[in-house]
From Swiss-Prot:
Signal sequence segment: none
InterPro entries (alphabetical): Amanitin/phalloidin (IPR027582)
Keyword tags: Hydroxylation, Thioether bond, Toxin
Covalent cross-link (Cyclopeptide (Ile-Pro)), residues: I11-P18
Residue positions where 4-hydroxyproline is found in the record: P18
Species of origin: Amanita fuliginea
Protein name according to UniProt: Alpha-amanitin proprotein
Post-translational modification note: Processed by the macrocyclase-peptidase enzyme POPB to yield a toxic cyclic decapeptide. POPB first removes 10 residues from the N-terminus. Conformational trapping of the remaining peptide forces the enzyme to release this intermediate rather than proceed to macrocyclization. The enzyme rebinds the remaining peptide in a different conformation and catalyzes macrocyclization of the N-terminal 8 residues.
Cross-link (2'-cysteinyl-6'-hydroxytryptophan sulfoxide (Trp-Cys)): W12-C16
The keyword Membrane belongs to this UniProt entry's keyword annotation: no
Coiled-coil regions, chain positions: none
Residues annotated with (3R,4S)-4-hydroxyisoleucine modification: I11
One Pfam family here: Amanitin
Length: 33
């Protein structure tokens, strides 16, 4: 269980935390641009 949770933690973190999602989006945008 702990391994599965650890693997899905980043995904759930981005989905639950708008601020984190914004940071990731900014990084992806700047990286692609």
């Amino acid at each position: 269980m702990s391994d599965i949770n650890a693997t899905r933690l980043p995904i759930w973190g981005i989905g639950c935390n708008p601020s984190v999602g914004d940071e990731v989006t900014a990084l992806l945008t700047s990286g692609e641009a």
